[in-house]
Amino acid sequence: MDYGIAIPSYIDAWKDVQAAEKAGFTHAWFFDSQLIYSDVWATMALAAQNTNRIKLGTLVAIPSNRIVPVTAAAAATINKLAPGRVIVGIGTGYTGRNTMGLPALKMKEFKTYVSQLKGLLDGKDVLFQEGDKERWIKLIHSKENSGRDDFYNIEDPIPVMVAANGPKGQEIVGEISDGWITTGRSLNVPEGIPKIMESAKRSGNSFDRFGGNATKPYVTVLTSSCVLREGEAVSSERVLRNVGPTLVPGVHAMWESSFGPGSNLGISNSSIAEDYDKYIKEYGDKKNPSTPPDRRYLDVHEGHYAYLKEGEEKFVSNDLIARTLTGTPIEISEKLDYLESIGVNNVALSVVDSRSAQELIKDFGEKIISERTGL
């Protein structure tokens, strides 16, 4: 099992990534949401410059945030700083688009973008379209093409992983990606892996960039964790602070499905959505009574994966916390055993800020990683 820390990109995260590397974490994942976090590539660049072994990945980059040659150049540049340690996780967009009042990207556009990105990172010529114009593009100053190696690095492979929960997304994972990113909220790994493997078989795709079994995708599950201290309850203030903000985004998605502009996320619960709509109206009106109703989504996504808004804790239940890797060291280890048994290769553990990162790094590193790896 690989162990990752997942960070809502704050620019000084390199300090926590450095500590995570020392504690035995194998991966650091960075969120890409331009209106609520620091720039993901700038944050990764600092982490790359200040670490030696830990792998660095986006979780996940959003196609509409940057045209494909910009994303390719960014990833290849980080790969120059951290050769062979870069992974591009990519998805159709949740907060990266919902914070702009937009739904997730359509699958046809998404597939085209992923295919072009992989082509560019593999040093190929790619047909790029802007409006009604189609033009061939490539990373011109790669070492192989120009002899220069001071701009970026595509000689060391950069795996591209696709985030997907539904069947159409899983089809794309199998057809063109190097691995699969999903969430621990609705654990669909046992059903998803066979579908992805079948899609890969039909298209002739291989997952060999991660080594091991080339026919099975490398699977990363995004979740969160808090190692309970002796006598501590899952409902403690510390657990709520560290884990709660990673759970309410699911409620935000339910609100979007019923009331917001990002209605194609596929996460719906009308009852919870109605309760949250009532809450967010009261919260927004208290904060700024003059906020127009058509900007309500801006209040919804405040605090996303970073903190709980006042009153938002009522949407974090013990049942939701139980779905995360929160518990005693023995309980967490048992959950990891189960995840490993169903084909999960990497757990990406969300933190909300540097304080929660340092707590997780210390507790999970000492009581889980060290015990399981013997290091």
Show which residues each predicted segment covers:
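N-terminal beta1-alpha1-beta2 module of alpha/beta enzyme domains
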Residues: 1-59, 158
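Alpha-helix-loop-beta-strand connector modules within alpha/beta enzyme cores
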Residues: 41-58, 113, 120, 364-375
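Acidic (Asp/Glu)-rich catalytic clusters
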Residues: 18-22, 44-55, 75-86, 174, ...
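Hydrophobic faces of well-ordered beta-strands that scaffold small-molecule active sites
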Residues: 3-7, 28-30, 55-59, 86-90, ...
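An alpha-helical appendage that flanks or caps ligand/catalytic pockets
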Residues: 103, 107-150, 191-338
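Short, acidic/polar
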Residues: 9-20, 74, 164-172, 328-338
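Active-site mouth loops of central-metabolism enzymes
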Residues: 1-11, 61-68, 155-165, 225-228, ...
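Acidic-and-aromatic substrate-binding clefts and catalytic sites of carbohydrate-active enzymes
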Residues: 7-12, 32-39, 63-69, 187-191, ...
